[in-house]
Each structure stands twice: as C-alpha cells, then as structure tokens.
Amino acid sequence: MAVPAASSIVSYGGAATSNFLTTPVTPFLAGFYNSNFVTDRINSCAPYRVDRIRKQLQDEEENGYPPADDRRRGALFCRSGTWLEMLPIENPDDGSTRVKVHGTKEESSKFSIVEFVSVAMSLVSIRGVETKNFICMDPSGKLYATPSSNYSTECVFLEEMMENYYNLYASCAYGDRFNPWYIELRRSGKPRRGPNSKKRRKASHFLVVHHDLDRLRSPVPNGNDVTDLVVASLFHQPPSHPLFRQQTVTKPPNPHRISNLRAKVEMTNQAEKQRLLEEKKRRREKKKRRREDRLRKEEQIREARRQELKSLREEELRRRYQQQQQQQASTQTRYNRPQNPANPYPTYRPLPTRSTVQSPRPAYNPYWQSPVTQAPHHNSHHHHHHHPRVSSSSDPQQRHQSQQHYLAQTVSNPNRQNVNYQRYP
C-alpha cells in the first residue's frame, strides 16, 4: 500500500529493513522464521553482526565514511495514538544531556524520525536520526537510549509482522519465544516494561511510516495526515464512524424538541410569537394551579389523619383510666372483707394415710432359688413310666404347709448360720 502525499512519498506497513511488501508474510515464511534452524542461526550470528555494525558506525562518525544504502528512514506510530520519539533532555545541574524514549502526540517532531539497521534475518535495530542513539532494553525490561559506541545485543529487536500490517518489536537479548518482551507505549506516552507487555495489546502494535527522503527536494518530517490513510487502524471505530459512512446516503430530517425550539426562535411574526408566549404563560399558570390543588389535598389528608390519631389516643387513655379504677375498687373490697376472730389460725391436720399399707421390701437374697414347678400330669397321656399319685388330702392345715414350703428356704451360708432368706416378691 503506497500512497503518494503532497509533501513526501510515504509508504505504510511492511517490514522496516526489508523491501516493501504489499501483502503480509505468508504462512510458509512465518513458519520458516519461527523454525529452530533460523532461530539458532540468528542466535549464533547476532553477536558477530553486532560487533561489525558497531565498528561500521564508529567509522562513519569518526572517519566520515558514507552511511550504508540499505537503511530505511521513517517513523513508528503506536496503535495507542502516539509516535515513538527519542527526545534529548539537558540536565541543568551538570549540563549533561540524556535521551528519553517515550511517545509523543506531535506528528511533526523531528526527533520521531528513526532509521532501521538490519542485523540479521528479522532482526533490526532502531536508531534516532537526530540523536544518533539506539533504542535498547535493559534486563529489567526498561527502554533506554545509548550512543553508537555502546551498541550491543540489547539494542537488537526481533521484528514480526501481523496480519493487520502492524509490526511487533521484541527484545532479542531478553525474554523467550513463549514470553517475549515487546516495546510498548501507553496512551500517555510512557513506555511499559518488557515483562508486562502483551502481544495482543494495542500499545505494542506499531505502524511503520517510511520516508524516502532522498527523492524529496524539500523533506518535511512526518508531513502527512495519517488519519486520511489508515483510518480504521488509528481510530479503532466501528463502521458507523463518519469516515466510513457513505456520503451519498442522507437521513431524512427527524423533528424533535430542539428543532421545534429553533423554529420558534427564528420566527419573525410578532403576533404569532405573542400568541405562543401567552399560551406558554397559561400553561405555566395551569401547572402552578394544579400543584397548589395537589398540595391542598395532601394537607387535608394529613389533617384528617392527625384528628384520627388524636381520637384514638384519647380513647386509649380513657380505657386505661377505667382499668385502673376497677383495680383500685377490687383492692379496696379485699381489704374491707371481715376476718374470723374465733379461729384466726387454722389447726394442723396431718396428711391422710393410705388405706393399703405396704410392708417394707425384704433384703436381696443372692442364694435364693426359684421353686421347682412340677410338670402337670395329664390323664389322657400314657407314658411308659408311672408317676406316683399325690394323695389329695382334705386337711386345710396340711395344704397350707405345702404352700409355705415355696415361700422360704433354708440355705447354709459361709458363716454356717441357717437363715431363712426371701427374694424380692
């Protein structure tokens, strides 16, 4: 996507150090870049390339050698709405100057123009054109700027192109393949540390704006309107945004209160205006009268409620007074009752005894044995052995002695004392 502008030739998207591509990286190349072969080759060749680039830059600055032709210049626009800038700041105490890496809203800042130095396949370094400093990332993930004499592997970043033509720049020295440390700029312009960066966050997406300054007679830094070229990426608005809306489609006028008021203000007929004012005054008076009626009715309801509560309170007090009078009358009647002087104290009368007096329970007899119950003899049964017949005597004294045999038993205890024991009945 190459769009000519009035003041410069600008190309949007694509890789920073490679030739401009009109389409994103194919899946084959994406897999090739992520393969172990390419990764191992980059890790083995990057230190050597870094040393060679440092010597080349020193020769350019000290001996005046011409710069390399493969370097592209441009600017990095963050999707959060800021331009990557390397601003020199002078310290008033000692007079030293340091370069601050941050994001700026100024589109025409000359400190936002950078050049991309190719280190290896998909490895680039970002250098400010005005400050001659490289953007680096320290072990804590903080961005800083360093001169060409201190150029190291911390100044090398892995460039990755996404499907939406935005680029990601991850630190080559720190982080890993699964948790890379990206360059991120907040909406306020403050950079975020590498360990806290995310791939899918807008603050880590950068749009490469290339400037072919050699072809321009009067180069203007960032002399273009980015909003006219990549509206969808910069505004992050749905298709209902005015820049996406078709100009040929016009909506019918929708009358509402504001349009009615505007028509009343623009009215030139004084008689009509006076009529509208009188009608408005009548509506205001009617509204005021209705409000007064409503307040009057509410006051009447409140007064009726107060009278009802007052009558209920008086009735409750009257009822309590009557109860108190009744209690006093009953108490006076009890005190006025005559006493019996013949027998002022009641005589003591013992409790009536029970008619059936039970005898005390005998002591427990551990040697007591239950009487042997003889099996009944049935005349109808014929056994092989003969049971001795019990002589049935008609003497009641003899029958009583036979029954007393089972009530008491004579048992010899360890003390050799024959005592009659009885078990609990």
Swiss-Prot record:
GO-annotated biological processes: fibroblast growth factor receptor signaling pathway; negative regulation of cell projection organization; nematode larval development; neurogenesis; positive regulation of cell population proliferation; positive regulation of MAPK cascade; regulation of axon extension involved in axon guidance; regulation of cell migration
Superkingdom to which the source organism belongs: Eukaryota
Region (Disordered): 277-298, 314-425
Bias kind Polar residues: ranges: 329-340, 395-425
Topological category with respect to the lipid bilayer: Peripheral membrane protein
Gene3D superfamilies: 2.80.10.50
GO cellular component entries: cytoplasm; extracellular space; membrane; nuclear speck; nucleolus; nucleoplasm; nucleus
One Pfam match: FGF
Keyword vocabulary terms for this entry: Developmental protein, Growth factor, Membrane, Nucleus
Chief localization: nucleus
CDD domains: beta-trefoil_FGF
Compartments, as annotated in UniProt: Nucleus; Membrane
Compositionally biased tracts (Basic residues): 281-291, 378-389
Expression sites (tissue/organ): Expressed in pharynx, CAN neuron and body wall muscles.
Single annotated GO MF: fibroblast growth factor receptor binding
Protein task: Required for larval development. Probably by binding receptor egl-15, negatively regulates membrane protrusion from body wall muscles during larval development.
Family under the similarity heading: Belongs to the heparin-binding growth factors family.
Subunit structure: Interacts with pal-1.
Name this protein carries in UniProt: Protein let-756
Organism for this UniProt entry: Caenorhabditis elegans
